[in-house]
Structure formats: structure tokens, C-alpha cells
Amino acid sequence: MGDKAKGEGMVWGLEAGPGEASLCHTGLEDMLLFFPETLAILSDTGEPQGELTIEVQKGKYKDDLGILTHCLLVHASSRGFLDKSVCGSSLLGYLNEHLELMEQHSQEFIKFPIIPMERKMSVLKQDDQLVVSRSVKEGEETKTGVSVFPCKSLKGFVSSAANVVLLRVMAWRQSVPSGARFLALDSEGKLCYCTYKSLGFQTIQVGNQQAEMFIVEQTIHSEDGIPFSCQFYLLSDGHLAKRVQVGSPGCCIITKMPLIREEDVIEPPPTFDRKPLVWEEDLELYSKFLDRKEQLRLSHTRYLRQHPEAQALVSDFLLFLLLRRPEDVVTFAAEHFGPFAALRSPIPALRSSHQPSPFRSLEEEEEGEEEEEEEEEEEEGEEEGEGKEEVEEVEIEGDDDYLYVDEEEEVEDDIYYDSYYYKYEDENIYEDENIYYDNYDVDNDNDDIDNYDNDDDDDDDVDDDDDVKVDDDNVDVDNDNVDVDNDNI
């Protein structure tokens, strides 16, 4: 029976085998299924006999281990009269999000004057089993029974509590799955199957209003007894407007039309076009702008007054920039302000024509400067070697002797003359005291150079071996105006 029902059934919101869909994906909260409702119990003549109350709400379930879990709490109760005898029923069930039963307790009673009757049933899930406990009391006699079903064989089981929620889901969807077949328990606590069928729509009068109802019929097919069928007239929001038990003269019906709740339609947020802000025309914004502008101006002026060196640095830079007018202003600025950096290495004394980039790292710049110094030393060594081999001689004509000037060597004028006069004043150097010397004029420097002859011969026609060589690159010797008298004694 169970496998057959599971194979043939199709579940809406329950896990009932192939083709099933879990209710957790249907959005119970979006359907607004949590609300109470009350119906009046009427006899076949329309007289009130009692009332039926149904409520579905969120709750918490505490298991045997003391663990609390969220659940759906279904509570229904009725109380009325049957043939002038008090009767009633109650239902309390706990369901998980898949409408699977966790615990359920139901009770029915009829207080007949002679033999009162009471029937109780408890369904409890323990481990992987569903334990059904049933007791029937008729007068003083009580019968009890316990049935155990494995949970793996109860896929698609619809309890009385799950039936209440499932009907509200069908009302929201205004449809019933075709061939909907589920497992259920009959009045004797035995496992059977139930079916749901749509009977279409019908308009009924509720007070002064008319409403269209969606009719669903549930039938419990018991193996030992006749089928038990109920018809449910449902409003579009899930409210139960009428309940009719097939074969019973009475019914349950609402006496007042409830406020039909519709699913909230989330409207997109309004979009507002951005208007251009012309702050110059806004008096408040323009006033704030002027105040802030004046505040910044005073702050800048105060800072420059406290730090005059800043204005001096900028003025110097602009002056050098306008004087040199470089093509690359950024590089020029980096070279100008580079020496002010605290981590910059000192500038070398000798620089090549290839200036290092101011944006290179310090290590690269130091390596480049070392290479440049080595190249400069090599170039100076080569120039000194060439100067010794090739000495450009400037010939100065005289009567008998020549004065050679080496233009490659750099000797300061005052240093040369000091050494010259020092030698001249030393009397031991010269054997001949009667040495006549003349002054000659050298252009640009206005210096007098006296040439002397310290040889032992008396012949003036013989050239002296000791000639004076004057090294000066910046001295221009005029051969036409210089008269050198050698050995005029």
C-alpha cells in the first residue's frame, strides 16, 4: 500500500517520492499561510450547533534530547452538539518545513447520556520510526493499540495537521495536482491512502457579499471501512469558507466575510532624475563657498608668513627656470630641488657632460658617479702622456737666444715669479755678478720676465744651455714687441 501510494502519488509541498517538490521551496511565508480562522457549525436546518477554530502559526519544537527546532504549529478545535449531546474534537500537530510530521495529538468525544465515547490518537516520531498510539474508551471499557512504521516507508505521508496547511497552499495556487495521492491514517490508526480532487469553482453568499470559492475534495480510503470524504470551500487567500462532510447533515461555514489578503507586490523603487546643481545661484551654498575661500586664503597667508623660506625657494626656482628655459621642466625641477632631499648623496666634484637622471635610485646614481670618475681619471692620464710627447713650442725671436713657452702646463703666474725671484736673489747661484737684464712687456698679464745667462763663457754668440721655459696657457706672447737681450754685459 505504501509503495503503491508513493509511486502513484504526486506531492505538492511534500516529499512523496518521484515527481515531488519540497514545501520549503514554495515560500510559505510569501503565501501568508499563518492566520487563525473561525467557522460556525450549522445543522441541516441552519441552526448553529457550535464553532470550529483553526490556527497555523510558527512555533518551536523540543525533542527528547531537549533540542529546540523551528516548526509549524497547527491547532484546531471544535465544540458543539450532536443530537443534543455535547461533542468536540481537538488537534495539535508539529510539522517541519517539508510538512513532515514531528508530533501530533488528536482527540474526539461524544458525551452520550448512557455510553459516552472518547477516542485519542498520538503520533510521535522516534529515531527512524513513526509510533502511533491509539486508545478508545466506551463507557468504562478502554482499548489501546500501538503501531510502528519505519519512516523510510512513509514518504508522502499526510497527517491531519499537514492537511490543514496543504489545503491553504492549494487555495493560493487555485489548483490541485492531478492524480494527487498520499499516505494517511484512517480513524482506526491504520495506514491507508488519501486522494485530493478539484471540484471547480462556485460562488456562494456570505452575509451581504458574494465570493468565489475553490472547492477541493479529500477522500481517505480505508481498507476496512467505507471511504471518508470532506469538501473544502476555500477563498483565494487560503481561508476556509465552508466545510462539508459527505453524508453528514451539518456543515461548517463562515458567518462574516474575512478581509481577503493578497500577496504583496513589490514595486520597483522610484527613480528620480538627477537635477544639475547650480551652487552659484544657491545663496546658502555660495555663502559657504565664500567663507571657505576666505578661510583658506587666511590660512595660506599665515603659513607663508611663518615660513618665508618657502616663498624664497619658489622664487629662486622660477628665476632659474626663466633664465635657462629648459625643454624638460620636470627634470629641471627635480635637479633643482634634488639637493634639498635628506637622503640624497652628495654631488661629486667632477661631473661628465652626461648628467645622471634625477629620477634614478640612489644606488644607481652612486654607481654611475663612480664610473664617471674612473673615466675622467683615465682621460686625464692619457692627456698627460700626450702632453709629454708632443709639446707645442712657441718660438720667440731674439738676437741670439730663444724663449720656449710650454702651453700645455698650467702654472700660476705669481707662483712662477716667486720661484724665479727667489733664485735670482741667491748670490751663490751666479758666478757672474754683472748680469744685465731688460724688461719686456707681455700682453694681458702686464708681467715682467727677466731672462738671464749664468754660463761661464764670454761669447754672446753662443747659445746658453739653460733656457727659461714659461708655462702659462692664458699668457699671450707677442713676438714682435718683446726684446730679449741675452748676455749684454
Swiss-Prot record:
The keyword Nucleus applies. Keywords: Cell membrane, Cilium biogenesis/degradation, Cytoplasm, Cytoskeleton, Membrane, Nucleus. It comes from the Eukaryota. The gene is Catip. The keyword Cell membrane applies. This is Ciliogenesis-associated TTC17-interacting protein. One of its GO terms (cellular component) is plasma membrane. Pfam families: CATIP_N. Interacts with TTC17. Belongs to the CATIP family. Expressed in testis and ovary. Strongly expressed in pachytene spermatocytes and round spermatids compared to spermatogonia and somatic cells. Expressed in Leydig cells (at protein level). PANTHER family: CILIOGENESIS-ASSOCIATED TTC17-INTERACTING PROTEIN, RIIA DOMAIN-CONTAINING PROTEIN 1. Residues 363-412 have a biased composition (Acidic residues). Residues 350-412, 438-489 are annotated as: Disordered. GO terms for biological process: actin filament polymerization; cilium organization.
